[in-house]
């Protein structure tokens, strides 16, 4: 089972480590926003950066370059994860996927319904999509704090429903948080995506061509009214999952290259600092062979995951989490409370109750060594909306008061949900769960 377990372990370790960086960036943003440097810190993100080419100009504030540009890479990685999970991962088997699917649906619908119910007739109704999100990095980070007490099945369940939750968030952004649509740009962008899919289908994949085409699609979507990050998801779905060469071919060819390299080394009387041309050619061949052994999808996911986890998401949190904690007349405490409650209660009820019913009616089954109390704990962790909630917040509102009020609700709601989830899991877990080994 190592071929399944090892990638999952690597994913969890990466998400756990990144959650620490993400948390640190968020705390730093909150400290700066509530210090004497507040005006300079918050004002910095409003400075404009312009890219100007003959016949083309793109000018946006720093905050928009992060939220529309860098976050498109984040959504590209989400798209890669979704495609992998659906084709060969936990979501490829309907029986195994049924519980994460119903949990994710409940975890999206109930918070939105609760928010609309609580906020009926009050300012900020556009924010109904904010409590639907789950931050996979933070939720997995808290789960990993419990170490071997947590069964692997519970971690896989959390990963799976969080990925489906991300897919739901993408659809919500595409259909409900897009502005006036320019159909010419949309259709051209979709035509390019379709072309890339056809090229991928016929094994005509070129990372350089796909990269250039991806930038064109991003610009088209940016100027179309659909949020530019959707381009990242669509482009990810065109990346091939098939490998160019078999692992046995890699071994045989690799051995041949290494043997040639070794022969060149033996010709030298001593280990020289400078390699000869044949040795350099061998290194180039080995690098090309190594890249072809992993599928383009797996290669890109592996290469980009670290950048997203340790650079893009922390930078996003640093730019967006800064909010002045002032419960004065300027803060919409009702909106903040409603978002917070929807994340804590709505997520818990949606994930746990729907999962419980699915299990009782034999639609799904609990993962191995998982009990209902630990399922309840993970249901609370689903209320850690954080990065995705902050992202939707910026799309839902234009009023600074509503944006900041929602941020307070997101931060407090995520904190309480995370704490409740940790405590429930801490009490439900045994001192050492053998299934975690």
Question: Which residue stretches match the model-derived regions?
Answer:
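Hydrophobic core segments of alpha-helical transmembrane domains in multi-pass membrane transport
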Residues: 21-34, 74-80, 110-112, 192-197, ...
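Predominantly late transmembrane helices and immediately cytosolic-facing juxtamembrane segments
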Residues: 4, 10-14, 206-213, 228-368, ...
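Entry/N-cap segments of selected transmembrane alpha helices
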Residues: 85-112, 182-191, 327-348, 410-414
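Structural signature of hydrophobic alpha-helical transmembrane segments
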Residues: 64-75, 122-137, 178-191, 229, ...
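Functional cores that coordinate and move charged inorganic groups
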Residues: 143-249, 253-258
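C-terminal ends of transmembrane helices
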Residues: 5-9, 77-92, 140-151, 194-204, ...
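Hydrophobic transmembrane alpha-helices of secondary-active transporters
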Residues: 55, 59-88, 307-327, 345-352, ...
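Transmembrane alpha-helix boundary signature
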Residues: 32-44, 60-63, 77-92, 110-129
């Amino acid at each position: 089972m190592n071929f399944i377990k090892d990638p999952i372990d690597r994913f969890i370790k990466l998400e756990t480590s990144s959650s620490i960086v993400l948390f640190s960036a968020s705390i730093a943003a909150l400290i700066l926003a509530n210090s004497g440097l507040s005006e300079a810190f918050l004002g910095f993100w409003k400075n404009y950066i312009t890219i100007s080419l003959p016949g083309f100009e793109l000018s946006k504030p720093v905050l928009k370059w992060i939220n529309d540009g860098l976050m498109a890479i984040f959504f590209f990685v989400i798209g890669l994860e979704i495609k992998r999970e659906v084709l060969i991962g936990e979501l490829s088997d309907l029986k195994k996927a049924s519980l994460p699917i119903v949990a994710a649906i409940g975890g999206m619908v109930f918070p939105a319904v609760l928010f609309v119910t609580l906020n009926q007739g009050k300012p900020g109704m556009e924010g109904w999509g904010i409590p639907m999100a789950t931050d996979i990095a933070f939720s997995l980070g808290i789960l990993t704090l419990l170490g071997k007490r947590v069964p692997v099945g519970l971690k896989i369940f959390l990963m799976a429903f969080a990925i489906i939750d991300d897919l739901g968030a993408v659809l919500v952004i595409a259909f409900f948080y897009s502005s006036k649509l320019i159909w010419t740009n949309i259709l051209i962008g979709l035509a390019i995506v379709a072309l890339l899919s056809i090229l991928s289908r016929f094994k005509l994949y070129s990372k350089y061509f796909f990269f250039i085409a991806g930038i064109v699609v991003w610009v088209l979507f940016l100027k179309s009214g659909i949020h530019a990050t959707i381009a990242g998801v669509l482009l990810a779905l065109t990346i091939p999952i098939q490998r160019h060469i078999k692992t046995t071919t890699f071994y045989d060819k690799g051995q041949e290259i290494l043997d040639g390299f070794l022969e060149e080394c033996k010709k030298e009387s001593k280990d020289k600092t400078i390699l000869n041309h044949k040795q350099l050619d061998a290194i180039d061949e080995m690098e090309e062979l190594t890249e072809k052994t992993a599928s383009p999808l797996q290669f890109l996911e592996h290469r980009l995951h670290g950048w997203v986890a340790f650079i893009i998401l922390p930078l996003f949190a640093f730019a967006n989490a800064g909010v002045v904690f002032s419960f004065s007349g300027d803060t919409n405490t009702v909106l903040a409370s409603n978002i917070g409650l929807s994340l804590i209660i709505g997520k818990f009820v949606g994930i746990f109750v729907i999962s419980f019913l699915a299990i009782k009616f034999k639609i799904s089954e609990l993962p191995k060594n998982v009990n209902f109390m630990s399922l309840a704990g993970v249901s609370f962790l689903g209320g850690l909306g954080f990065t995705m909630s902050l992202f939707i917040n910026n799309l839902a509102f234009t009023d600074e008061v509503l944006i900041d009020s929602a941020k307070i609700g997101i931060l407090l709601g995520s904190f309480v949900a995370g704490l409740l989830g940790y405590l429930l899991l801490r009490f439900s877990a045994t001192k050492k769960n053998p299934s975690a080994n």
